[in-house]
Amino acid sequence: MMKRVALFKENDFNDLHMSRLLVHDSPYFKILNFNFRAGQELPIHSHEIEGQLSIVVLEGEGEFLGKEGATIPAGPGDTLISDISEPHGIRARSDLRVLVTIAPPI
């Protein structure tokens, strides 16, 4: 099976909160697209399960967020890879589009 998703057409921005699009969900992995307006964020959180995630910045500028107030600059092409049990989040400094992959899916 092959599937094409035009992320920029399927998921727009929302002035009130981040927007979320489930791109793909299977027994093997999940892909999500999050769009943030400047100043919006996905608060730091973690999942008490085994697995890994990646967050790829497609467009815009922001910060990857971690435990104890850690911040890592995030721009186009930057990728965060982490165990899913590690605290993680993201904050937008400009309009920001990210693609998140989770394996196995939660």
Question: What are the residue ranges of the model-derived segments?
Answer:
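Histidine-centered metal-chelating micro-motifs
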Residues: 41-43, 80, 84-89
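A short, N-terminal "cap"/entry segment at the start of jelly-roll beta-barrel domains
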Residues: 1-32, 43
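A cytosolic small-molecule/anion-sensing beta-strand core signal
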Residues: 58-59, 75-76, 94
